[in-house]
Amino acid sequence: MSTREIRIATRKSALALWQAEYVKARLEQAHTGLQVTLVPMVSRGDKLLDAPLAKIGGKGLFVKELETALLDNEADIAVHSMKDVPMDFPEGLGLYCICEREDPRDAFVSNTFDSLEALPAGSIVGTSSLRRQAQLLARRPDLQIRFLRGNVNTRLAKLDAGEYDAIILAAAGLIRLGFEDRITSTISVDDSLPAGGQGAVGIECRSADVEIHALLAPLHHVDTADRVIAERALNKRLNGGCQVPIACYAVLEGDQLWLRGLVGQPSGGTLLVADARAPRAAAEALGVQVAEDLLGQGAEAILKEVYGEAGHP
């Protein structure tokens, strides 16, 4: 295989750049002499910071600009947080690598209180996620959920300024950026089921670029990929973008996958849950099965209501 340069399309946020640098280091470690450069760019989701994500359009909000760079041959691969990656790809592009997953749980961050349970009634909790909001309010309907956008540093600064009593963030992002000490407590997946793909990094590239596929192979983590495939299949069957109150989380039990799924009203009034097990080779079918269970319980009506409020399909 000839030595070549790989250009990585990435968003400019600190977390996105960390993920791109991680992939760069792994590629250079796996392939001596390979030149890897970053091509930072701004996504639509990065520009629109004054509105809840659910209101500004769900699918592909953080990836479209990166995909355009791949299609225009301005970059060779794009590095994404898997929870932001739409289910379908533009013609000529595909997902060819999923890296090993970091901690997939949600993190409770507060300067005053030790845990979600310790928050007094009426406490203000910051999150931009309808998934987190639905599960939080189902457990603690006495809390106030307040909109929170911006990068990790911005969100922590808003907490430190006293705008919130606590905020909920992905543990993976805090760990990767060196803010592990800011995690007051991690929230069990039993109490806050993660978003599909949360904590995993995916790599998208051109479908025809087989040399790139081969270079990415050492970074692919099969155990993570099988879990994420099941989660994404559930999301796809529910027509879920990254900004809907859908949660799903798969774990490996030997050669079996156990997938849990959840759809909730943002008010926390109704939470639908389902789970099933299947051989890991049937990951995609498992995702569809759990999604069908949720649909049978009435998930479609909840999701239609959310999409209607957001003003997009």
UniProtKB/Swiss-Prot annotation:
<comment type="subunit">
    <text>Monomer.</text>
</comment>
<dbReference type="InterPro" id="IPR000860">
    <property type="entry name" value="HemC"/>
</dbReference>
<dbReference type="InterPro" id="IPR036803">
    <property type="entry name" value="Porphobilinogen_deaminase_C_sf"/>
</dbReference>
<protein>
    <recommendedName>
        <fullName>Porphobilinogen deaminase</fullName>
        <ecNumber>2.5.1.61</ecNumber>
    </recommendedName>
</protein>
<dbReference type="InterPro" id="IPR022417">
    <property type="entry name" value="Porphobilin_deaminase_N"/>
</dbReference>
<dbReference type="Pfam" id="PF01379">
    <property type="entry name" value="Porphobil_deam"/>
</dbReference>
<dbReference type="GO" id="GO:0005737">
    <property type="term" value="C:cytoplasm"/>
</dbReference>
<keyword id="KW-0627">Porphyrin biosynthesis</keyword>
<dbReference type="Pfam" id="PF03900">
    <property type="entry name" value="Porphobil_deamC"/>
</dbReference>
<comment type="similarity">
    <text>Belongs to the HMBS family.</text>
</comment>
<dbReference type="InterPro" id="IPR022418">
    <property type="entry name" value="Porphobilinogen_deaminase_C"/>
</dbReference>
<dbReference type="GO" id="GO:0004418">
    <property type="term" value="F:hydroxymethylbilane synthase activity"/>
</dbReference>
<comment type="function">
    <text>Tetrapolymerization of the monopyrrole PBG into the hydroxymethylbilane pre-uroporphyrinogen in several discrete steps.</text>
</comment>
<dbReference type="GO" id="GO:0006782">
    <property type="term" value="P:protoporphyrinogen IX biosynthetic process"/>
</dbReference>
<dbReference type="InterPro" id="IPR022419">
    <property type="entry name" value="Porphobilin_deaminase_cofac_BS"/>
</dbReference>
<keyword id="KW-0808">Transferase</keyword>
<feature type="modified residue" description="S-(dipyrrolylmethanemethyl)cysteine">
    <location>
        <position position="242"/>
    </location>
</feature>
<comment type="pathway">
    <text>Porphyrin-containing compound metabolism; protoporphyrin-IX biosynthesis; coproporphyrinogen-III from 5-aminolevulinate: step 2/4.</text>
</comment>
